[in-house]
Amino acid sequence: MNDSEFHRLADQLWLTIEEHLDDWGGDSDIDCEINGGVLTITFENGSKIIINRQEPLHQVWLATKQGGYHFDLKGDEWICDRSGETFWDLLEQAATQQAGETVSFR
């Protein structure tokens, strides 16, 4: 994968997250902001999830209250380089915990 392909795929990931949060119908308030390639999700309780791209490594990084995760693209899924879990699984787990209600991005 070259740099432009990596950025295209990361942009697609950001857009999917943003669209799901724009359509969020849950009880808690969840905000999403993209600034300089960093996506920040802020929850009603003040906690945050930060997602950014690491161009030199072609990785997506996810920072949550539970910890930090690094994802490599394997096939068509972003997979954690430590646990083998998908980006979406870990994001949904963290967002659900931080929102206090079920949050789905799929």
Curated annotation (Swiss-Prot):
<dbReference type="InterPro" id="IPR036524">
    <property type="entry name" value="Frataxin/CyaY_sf"/>
</dbReference>
<dbReference type="GO" id="GO:0008199">
    <property type="term" value="F:ferric iron binding"/>
</dbReference>
<dbReference type="GO" id="GO:0016226">
    <property type="term" value="P:iron-sulfur cluster assembly"/>
</dbReference>
<protein>
    <recommendedName>
        <fullName>Iron-sulfur cluster assembly protein CyaY</fullName>
    </recommendedName>
</protein>
<dbReference type="InterPro" id="IPR020895">
    <property type="entry name" value="Frataxin_CS"/>
</dbReference>
<comment type="function">
    <text>Involved in iron-sulfur (Fe-S) cluster assembly. May act as a regulator of Fe-S biogenesis.</text>
</comment>
<dbReference type="Pfam" id="PF01491">
    <property type="entry name" value="Frataxin_Cyay"/>
</dbReference>
<dbReference type="GO" id="GO:0005829">
    <property type="term" value="C:cytosol"/>
</dbReference>
<dbReference type="GO" id="GO:0008198">
    <property type="term" value="F:ferrous iron binding"/>
</dbReference>
<dbReference type="InterPro" id="IPR002908">
    <property type="entry name" value="Frataxin/CyaY"/>
</dbReference>
<keyword id="KW-0479">Metal-binding</keyword>
<comment type="similarity">
    <text>Belongs to the frataxin family.</text>
</comment>
<dbReference type="InterPro" id="IPR047584">
    <property type="entry name" value="CyaY"/>
</dbReference>
<keyword id="KW-0408">Iron</keyword>
